[in-house]
């Protein structure tokens, strides 16, 4: 049973956009973004436009289906979070027009290493201006790397927040905001130098 199935059974249109990371593909077999997830393993969503795994926010490829129609693999034309949000917003507008209830998931990989957001967001934070946690050891290379990574990480978070705002504005404009539940969560954080460690917590 997947989350899509009870919603579909209750009459909701279900959609998934973004990182899947459930098909068990290993990078040693090639770049995971080019692994095609077979339709039976796409969670039973009515619309599924995603990829198995990917760590290149400016080189993201999607494939999947909309209804019965298969969607061939294609490259997103801009930064992953912005492009995936564009897809979600288009979907919300379609659902608002047909009046049917819907359940949609947006699974954006950022914030994730490499910590590079669009320039307008990267420019908001400089490594020199980043405050480190008290548990980051006084080791020059650790502190330099932590500051550099956090500057990009913060830019990615602000970009994601801006995209959530775009979703909320679209829901309001379509009269759906008061009847829509938005659930936001993350699968992990990063250490950014805490106890001298980096990457996933």
Q: What is the role of each PLM region?
A:
Residues 1-201:
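Formylglycine-dependent sulfatase
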